[in-house]
Design a protein with these regions (language model features):
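Divalent cation-coordinating acidic motifs and surrounding scaffolds
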Residues: 1-254
Length: 254
């Protein structure tokens, strides 16, 4: 099953053909030869005409089982400044420490800082109903306060130019575990970050228990004029939901 899932992931990443890729939920087992990140990058490079490298942080990215990561193509972009992580509250628990790295696009000489993020999910709610992160019955589920604090801290951090490279072209990518009209996204948009999807866009980034929604986002600083094209890694629905010929259905279920 691991090999099957990894092959699907490699196919999706190769099809992106991107110069910089943000990754979520990577096993947090370092950057060595046998680490999950090194293994994934190596497998991707076997099918990619332009090889990738991964960003290595000087600090341990938290103590969670998973982390965020960045891949880049040295043939298209150069690494500028340092790899920066925010480990202080509210990223010491729940929301994974964000990773930021500046890159120079070799063809245009433009600088951009890319931040990959993974905010606390809506699950595993606090047992104490008086907890500020408990379900408030406002449609935002639990841990909304933590996610909003994460959005504020992330915005302030990026404005401080954490990579040591000064650029007004910055982008926030990742799973913010919040819908666009919820407090974390509203804070970011009200504080200068521009969502790269039109407000009336009909799109989704996941399907869960038969319902689709968008918890994954891309927001840019006003100075960064970028085009966003959504790329679904998986089909929205399993093929078993379709009406298949018995022979095809039998083959698929083997």
């Amino acid at each position: 099953e691991f090999e099957r899932q990894r092959a699907k992931t490699i196919t999706a990443l190769a099809a992106l053909d991107a110069d910089v890729i943000g990754l979520l939920e990577v096993e947090n087992n370092g950057y060595g030869q046998h680490s999950a990140l090194a293994s994934l990058t190596g497998a991707l490079n076997k099918v990619s005409a332009k090889p990738y490298r991964f960003i290595i942080t000087s600090e341990q990215p938290g103590d969670d089982a998973i982390k965020v990561a960045l891949l880049y193509r040295p043939s298209s972009v150069s690494v500028e400044g340092k790899a920066a992580m925010l480990l202080a509250k509210p990223f010491d628990w729940g929301s994974r420490p964000p990773l930021a790295q500046s890159f120079r696009h070799l063809a245009s000489n433009e600088l951009v800082t890319v931040s990959i993020n993974h905010f606390k999910s809506k699950g595993s709610c606090p047992k104490d109903a008086a907890d500020v992160n408990a379900e408030q019955n406002d449609g935002q589920a639990c841990w909304n306060t933590l996610r909003t604090q994460s959005a504020k801290a992330l915005s302030d951090w990026l404005h401080s130019q954490p990579t040591g490279v000064t650029t007004d072209k910055q982008i926030i990518l990742g799973d913010l575990n919040a819908y666009r009209m919820e407090a974390p996204l509203q804070y970011l948009e009200q504080n200068g970050w521009q969502h790269l999807a039109p407000k009336d866009a009909v799109h989704s980034s996941f399907v869960y228990r038969g319902r689709s929604g968008t918890l994954d986002h891309a927001l840019a600083s006003p100075q960064l004029k970028a085009k966003l094209q959504q790329f679904h890694q998986n089909q929205l629905f399993l093929r078993s939901f379709e009406q298949l010929q018995p022979s095809l259905d039998q083959s698929w279920n083997q």
